[in-house]
Regions:
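Divalent-metal-activated hydrolytic enzyme cores
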Residues: 107-191
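Conserved mixed alpha/beta catalytic, RNA-binding, or beta-rich assembly cores of soluble enzyme
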Residues: 3-115, 194-197, 205-235
Length: 235
């Protein structure tokens, strides 16, 4: 079974996850709809089940944009990860489960928006298209959303480890070995910190450009007044 070296910076992004076996073929992602300081015990049990069963990474995800970008950065820096086991509830505001399914099925459009989801802000602005496509190609989604039994997560992880295919939840799972290409490195660029403020069409984009232009003119005018000194500025 071919296993690859991870990128030296693996995992490049910090987050709410447990790092396990770097040669594991599976990562576990549990959707979190609560604040980090209010994580219920049943969610913690699912995360621990993933880690204790041998997942490379096992943790939670709260947002469909920056949070998901961090997940993608971490996964593509380890070619050994070939499955993403997704569990937990749906997040009413973010629709994270729907977003992840849509990403695997449809990818992104020219604006870096995930296609085919009703989530309000499913934009991946801060990572490259190459990383997004590697994530989609390298991984197979094992969808356990709404399952609350840690034993099901354990069985999913176990199934991903097998040398011969086994049936699990309607899928054939086994360890196919590492993705044959070199790991991708990189962290999110933080170019866009608040995706929900980004324009979604040309009309909104034009309004944003005008607002930024006005702000820049006001900034320059204030700078000129400060250089003139109190006498001229005050008339």
């Amino acid at each position: 079974m071919f296993k690859a070296e991870t990128h030296p910076d693996y995992p490049p992004e910090e987050g709410c996850y447990i790092r396990g076996n770097d040669r594991s073929p599976v990562a576990v992602l549990i959707i979190l709809k609560w604040d980090q300081d209010k994580v219920p015990p049943e969610i913690e049990r699912l995360v621990r089940a993933g880690a204790e069963s041998g997942a490379a990474l096992s943790g939670t995800l709260q947002t469909e944009n920056i949070g998901l970008e961090k997940v993608i950065c971490n996964v593509v820096s380890n070619p050994n990860i070939r499955y993403l086991v997704m569990g937990g509830p749906e997040s009413p505001g973010h629709l994270i489960g729907e977003v992840i399914r849509a990403l695997f099925e449809n990818g992104i459009d020219e604006k870096q928006r995930i296609i085919g989801t009703e989530s309000p802000h499913p934009f991946l602005f801060n990572i490259s298209r190459e990383m997004i496509e590697r994530f989609r190609d390298q991984l197979t989604l094992v969808d356990l959303q709404f399952q609350q039994d840690p034993d099901i997560v354990r069985k999913a992880v176990w199934s991903c480890y097998q040398e011969e295919p086994v049936e699990f939840n309607g899928q054939e799972l086994y360890d196919p070995g590492a993705w044959p290409e070199a790991p991708l490195s990189g962290t999110i660029t933080w170019k866009i910190l608040q995706p929900y403020w980004e324009p979604e069409d040309e009309k909104q984009a034009e309004a944003k450009r005008k607002a930024l232009d006005l702000m820049e003119r006001i900034k320059q005018r204030n700078a000129e007044r400060s250089l003139e000194g109190p006498d001229k500025a005050g008339g």
